Amino acid sequence: MSGMPPHIPVLLKEVRSALRLGEGPGIVVDGTFGAGGYTRAILEADPGQRVIAIDRDPTAIATGRGLAAAMAGRLMLVQGRFGELDRLVRAQGIETVDGVVLDIGVSSMQLDQAQRGFSFRQDGPLDMRMESGGTSAADLVNEASEAELADIIYHYGEERRARAVARAILEARRRGRIATTATLAEIVASVVRPEPGSGIHPATRTFQALRIAVNDELGELQRALHAAERILRPGGRLAVVTFHSLEDRIVKQFFSARSGRAVSASRHLPMAEKPAPRSFTLVTKGPIGPSEAEATANPRARSAKLRAGERTDAPIPEPLTALAALAALPSRERGGGRR
């Protein structure tokens, strides 16, 4: 392990309040277990509280076994994707739950392990997979076309220099395979200048984009929101913490639509969907951010936003096609490929 600080769950006080922890025992799903920060806080809120903790990363599940043993049956660890949380929970014999919390983003454990290939701050193999199977970041960087790379970096990383980054990657590929995080960070830094005074590394947005693409993070998020809707009892709460605008946009659209407003997936899908039966009421009227004290104490919290809703007794509506459109790369035919 490096000298990085341990994982601190962000907006913990606000998440506790949104989930009404401490108001009696119940069953809460932590759909993004990670280092276990939220799970521990949920369990500590009430001696009768139970948690089903889900993570697709086998390392996170293995790390949590000590906590599960100490909780004497109150913590159930399940390896799987949080986009399938309703199926995973029902496989444990539980039909409905009282709360679901999702912390969307890479965990500090993953960033802290150079061999996982998530961070440009430590040299390691260019991987970024949250589970062992599937396409790695190295596969994507070395095999995708210039246009595909530019689209991924522009839309998932919101990198204005996406076309230049993609071109630089293609030029570097001609000299040999791009295999490490340090090599890729160097390539990106050769064409993206640091923003004065921002403290943001030039490779930040490109690494974010590749991680999102490799793990289908936005697709998983929109599936998880619908899965939580299906598993929550009436009166149950869903709390979602996001860290960048792409994630927050999906969560905002979901809660807006499910609380009775028509939504659109932006200019790429201009026709708004008609309001469905209100399956949620809003617990937070807008995003809740960190206090100044928390942002100072925990830099990871600076960009965090919390949105929460309470499940009504309305029937489960059809999934929102607008969310799937937000999670996908816009098609070039609709003009999504322009830079």
UniProtKB/Swiss-Prot annotation:
Gene3D superfamilies on file: Putative methyltransferase TM0872, insert domain (1.10.150.170), Vaccinia Virus protein VP39 (3.40.50.150)
EC number in record: 2.1.1.199
Main localization of the protein described in the UniProt heading: cytoplasm
Alphabetical list of InterPro entries matching this protein: RsmH, SAM-dep_MeTrfase_MraW_recog, SAM-dependent_MTases_sf
Keywords carried by this UniProt record: Cytoplasm, Methyltransferase, rRNA processing, S-adenosyl-L-methionine, Transferase
Chain residues that bind S-adenosyl-L-methionine: G36, G37, Y38, D55, F82, D103, Q110
Gene Ontology MF, one: rRNA (cytosine-N4-)-methyltransferase activity
SUPFAM superfamilies assigned to the protein according to its UniProt record, in alphabetical order: Putative methyltransferase TM0872, insert domain, S-adenosyl-L-methionine-dependent methyltransferases
Assigned protein family: Belongs to the methyltransferase superfamily. RsmH family.
Name by which UniProt lists this protein: Ribosomal RNA small subunit methyltransferase H
Naturally occurring in which organism (per UniProt): Methylobacterium nodulans (strain LMG 21967 / CNCM I-2342 / ORS 2060)
Gene from which the chain derives: rsmH
